[in-house]
């Protein structure tokens, strides 16, 4: 199973999924032309990863902005992560004073049965 490394663009986030480290990172802006097309390989990767995950899986989400269609796809990512055996923790980063992004993380946390850690940072 190959790691996923996608360089971010002004419309798509940087993605680093590293199986051996149990590290999944999504950061930047998520406003792709077709969210389903962008996120499907990530969701498929997590499905394969869940069959033999690392003991601990750290998911780092550092999004400065995402649109509505990305929101649904991000939820699908989290739903796939629920099936991962072992410890999974989501670190949800948000910029100070960005109440909308904090609330988005809290909304996902309320829906998904995975512990979230809300981390305020100066800048994403």
Residues of each region from the PLM?
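N-terminal amphipathic/basic leader segments beginning at the initiator methionine
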Residues: 1-15
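A short, well-ordered alpha-helical element
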Residues: 12-15, 31-56
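Extracellular beta-strand solenoid repeats
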Residues: 16, 25, 60-62
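Short, aliphatic-rich beta-strand segments
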Residues: 22-28
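Amphipathic alpha-helical interaction surfaces in cytosolic regulatory modules
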Residues: 42, 58-108
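Structural alpha-beta junctions
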Residues: 54, 84-88, 111-118
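A generic structural motif
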Residues: 93, 116-124
